[in-house]
Each structure stands twice: as C-alpha cells, then as structure tokens.
From Swiss-Prot:
This is Recombination protein RecR. The keyword Protein transport does not apply. It comes from the Bacteria. Keywords: DNA damage, DNA recombination, DNA repair, Metal-binding, Zinc, Zinc-finger. The lineage of its organism: Bacteria, Bacillati, Actinomycetota, Actinomycetes, Mycobacteriales. Belongs to the RecR family. The keyword Metal-binding applies. It comes from Corynebacterium diphtheriae (strain ATCC 700971 / NCTC 13129 / Biotype gravis). Residues 79-195 form the Toprim domain.
C-alpha cells in the first residue's frame, strides 16, 4: 500500500472495468512521469465527459445534444428499431454498414443477481416509442415524466440485438413477450452464428453483418 494521493489514484483506477490492482498501479506510476500539460488534458477530458455528454431523450444513446445524430438523421429508416444493451454496441453495428434504421439503448441487461430488473433499464421508453402504451403493469411506475416525442406508430420491426450470453438472452426473451402485445409488430433476433456467452462488441463485422441480414422472427 502506498500513501496519500498516489494510493487514492490507484484505488480510483481499480474501480474501472477491466482494470485490476496491478494495472491501476502501472497507470498511476505512468502519470507521475508525464508532462503537466498531459495531466491537464486528461483533467479536461474527464470534465468534458461529465459536463458535455448526455443521453439522447429518444433512444438513450450517448449524445452531446438533446437528440443524438442518428435520431436526428431524417434519412434513417423510422420503421425499424434495433435494441442494444450499451451505446458501444451501436458503434459495432454501424461499422457493418448493414443496418440503416434507428436504435434503442437499454442501458444494460436483466440480471437478478445484480438487482437489475425491468425498472432499471430503458424498457418503458422503448414501449412508448413504439406505441405510447405500457402493456406490462410492472413498468408503469418507471415511465419518464416527460413523454418522448418520438412515439412512432410506424415502427414495424424491433430487432433484439442484446448480447448472446445468459443475461442478454433473458432480456431478449422478456422483451419478446412484452412486444407481442403490439399488433402487426415484427420482433426479430440476430441469426445464429453469434458466439454464445460473448459480448456484441467482440463480434467481427462479417459475422454481425450476416447475423443482421439473416435475423430470425420470434
């Protein structure tokens, strides 16, 4: 254990995903030897994330504005919504060039062991976008105070692109059950070929492109 600010910095880095105690220590010691201007740039970048990044009020993607660039793009297909767990998953799908619709970010997946249920995810916002109603009573008290102005009865398909692991599959099954209450709505899931137990961000572009084009109706 070190003392004072150095140990405090190591402890903070250790809290980051994928950063263990040894990695945190290496990063902290690296920062001891960089130029003051580099420290200032790091401080500015951290402050910009806190003050300059928000969440799109339509799809819950990260954005610098009230509405993200994808939702604001009139050329995107409004009839299709691709549901993902995290904003990083959008970047993976966009790189395939296969999908031209819009997205909805859940903010995670159902995980009872971590006390993450439907109310902790952006599910009620998704249902409002599709038809402005909440078919599942357990979500009723999680409705945003400000209704989304993008409630779109023209949505014809929802693609469930949650991760192909236990939590992602459970989330997809839950959403598929909810979305059956919407008449004439097609609910689909990425086709087989996705590596089971993995995360969407680690799937190569060709595999993901094929999974999108060959998606299965639930």
């Amino acid at each position: 254990m070190f003392e004072g600010p150095l140990q405090d910095l190591i402890d903070e880095f250790s809290r980051l995903p994928g950063v263990g105690p040894k990695s945190a220590q290496r990063i902290a010691f690296h920062l001891l030897h960089v130029e003051p201007a580099d420290i200032t740039r790091l401080q500015d970048a951290l402050g910009a994330i806190r003050d300059g990044v928000t969440f799109c009020r339509i799809c819950c993607n990260i954005s610098r504005e009230e509405v993200c660039r994808i939702c604001a793009d009139s050329s995107r297909d409004r009839s299709t919504i691709c549901v993902v767990e995290e904003p990083k998953d959008i970047q993976v799908i966009e790189r395939t060039g296969e999908y031209t619709g819009r997205y909805h970010v859940l903010g995670g997946s159902l995980d009872p062991l971590a006390n993450i249920g439907p109310r902790e995810l952006n599910i009620s916002q998704l249902l409002q976008r599709i038809g402005g109603v909440l078919p599942d009573r357990e979500l009723a008290d999680s409705t945003p105070e400000t209704p989304l102005y993008d409630a779109s009865p023209e949505v014809r398909e929802v693609i469930l692109a949650t991760d192909p692991n236990t939590e992602g599959e459970a989330t997809a099954s839950y959403l598929a059950r909810l979305l059956r209450d919407f008449p004439d709505l097609v609910v689909s899931r990425l086709a087989s070929g996705m590596p089971l137990g993995g995360d969407l961000e680690f799937v190569d572009e060709l595999t993901l492109s094929r999974a999108l084009s060959g998606r299965l109706t639930l």
